[in-house]
From Swiss-Prot:
InterPro entries: Nucl_pore_cmplx (IPR012578). This is Meiotically up-regulated gene 31 protein. It is found in: Endoplasmic reticulum. It comes from the Eukaryota. The gene is mug31. PANTHER family: NUCLEOPORIN POM34. GO terms for biological process: meiotic cell cycle; nucleocytoplasmic transport.
Length: 229
């Protein structure tokens, strides 16, 4: 009886309807309740590090002074004073003034050659005296003694007058006799040129006469040798 019922057309239709209902119910459940499976992460450590969230670091903007000066830990690098600075005192620093030996010579020559107020007065007085003697010769007796004295006075006055005029006419000195370098002449305001040699104005006090070609045994000792009898 059971076998005939299961093999009947009605039983088969019921079985097929139940199977279709099960398939439809499974589709409805999947549509209503979707199931998301977890994605498999890659096994590469580099790729896994990319998926990790990066920690936010504080944005520190250094100042201009910090950029120029390196950060040095004072505990690791203690400050060391310069050698000998503690013993130096400003009061013991030698201070002085040095002047080139040729400065005095240059100043004296320029003073003697430059015309001054005395030169003007000397020139005017000699000129006035020379004109006065020429005027007095007309009233003096025409004797030999008077003529000789007049000529001597006129010669002296004329010499003084020409010497005064020469100070205004003569060229400027070049100081070629002084041993100066071109830089020294420029600093002193002298004209360029002139003979310069390698000699010193003040030669050194000691000049060693030792030649490196000599041997040690051939060099004589400065101490006087003594002989014993």
């Amino acid at each position: 009886m059971a076998s005939t019922f299961s093999q009947s057309v009605f039983a088969r239709s019921l079985y097929e309807d139940s199977a279709e209902n099960k398939v439809d119910s499974s589709k409805n459940t999947e549509a209503n309740f979707p199931i998301t499976l977890p994605k498999v992460l890659p096994t590469d450590p580099k790729a896994s590090s990319l998926h990790k969230p990066q920690e936010q670091q504080p944005n520190i903007i250094p100042s201009k002074e910090e950029d120029k000066k390196p950060v040095i830990n004072s505990m690791k690098l203690p400050s060391i004073p310069a050698p000998g600075t503690d013993n130096i005192n400003e009061s013991h620093i030698p201070r002085g003034y040095w002047k080139h030996p040729a400065v005095d010579k240059i100043a004296k020559r320029l003073h003697d050659q430059a015309p001054s107020d005395r030169t003007w007065s000397r020139m005017v007085s000699n000129l006035f005296a020379f004109i006065s003697i020429q005027f007095l010769n007309r009233y003096l007796p025409n004797t030999t003694a008077v003529k000789v004295v007049s000529w001597i006075l006129q010669a002296l006055l004329l010499f003084n007058l020409l010497e005064s005029v020469w100070q205004f006419v003569r060229p400027q000195p070049t100081f070629d006799d002084l041993q100066l370098t071109p830089l020294q002449r420029k600093l002193m305001g002298l004209p360029e040129g002139g003979s310069t040699s390698g000699k010193h104005l003040t030669p050194p006090r000691y000049r060693p006469n030792f030649s490196p070609s000599r041997k040690a045994e051939n060099v004589k000792s400065p101490v006087r040798s003594t002989t014993w009898a």
